[in-house]
Amino acid sequence: VAASYSTGHCALLEHPEHQEASATSSSWLAHDLEAWVCQPSRWSSQAALSGGDDCRLKLWDRRSAGACSRSLRHDAGVTMIVEHPTVPYLFLSGSYDESVRVWDTRALGRPVHSLSVGGGVWRLKWSACCQRLLCAAMYNGFKVLAFSSATGLQLLEEFNSPHSSIAYGADWVGSFSESDRQLVATCSFYDHLLCLWSHSF
C-alpha cells in the first residue's frame, strides 16, 4: 500500500499478517508541493510511481527510497497514475492540465498517446476488459475512453447531468444481464451526488 501527503512526502506501508496496524516501510520527500498520488508498481516489486502539484510524475527505485529514476514534466499538477492491467510497460497519467497521457517505460522521452478531456483529470479507472477507461474530468464531467496500442485514446461517451459540481469519483459496478452493458457509478463533490448509469460496449 502507498500513501501520498500534502507535505510532498510519499510512503510505502506494509500490513503484516496478524497485526492490526500498518507499518511504514519507507518514506521520502517526493515532490516540492503536495503529492497527489503514489503507487507501487504491480509489475515490478522494486518500482513505484508518484505525481504532485509540482507538475512532475516520478518513477522511483524502491530499493533506495528517495532515488528518483525518472522525472516527467506535465503542464500542471499530476493527479492520477494507473498502470495498464495487462501490458507491463504501459501506464497512464492524468493532470490538472486536462490531458490523459499514455507512457511507455521503454521510451519515456514523451507520451506515446495523449487526449484532452476538457477538465482536470481526478480519477481514471480501467474496465474489466482492459479496453475502456472511466475518467472523472473535474469541471467537465465524466468520460468513457477507449484505448488500444494501435489507435491510442478515444472519447466514446460523456455523462454530466444531473451532476452540478466537480466530477470526483467514478467506478465500474459489475454488469447488467446483457453482456454488452456495464453499470457505472459516478460522484460529484459539492452537491454530494452519487449517480448510476450504464455504458454500452
Predicted feature descriptions by range:
Residues 38-46, 82-89, 125-131, 171-181:
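Loop/turn segments within WD40 beta-propeller blades
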Residues 1, 48, 91, 133-134, ...:
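Hydrophobic beta-strand positions that form the internal "hydrophobic ladder"
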Residues 115-154:
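Loop/turn-rich, solvent-exposed surfaces of beta-rich toroidal or solenoidal domains
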Residues 15-18, 62-65, 105-108, 148-151, ...:
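Short loop/turn segments that connect beta-strands within beta-propeller blades
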Residues 169, 173-201:
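Blade-level signature of beta-propeller repeat domains, shared across WD40, Kelch, NHL, RCC1
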Residues 28-35, 71-78, 115-121, 159-167:
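WD40/WD-repeat beta-propeller blade N-cap
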Residues 4-7, 15, 50-54, 62, ...:
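Conserved strand-to-loop turn within each blade of WD40 beta-propeller repeats
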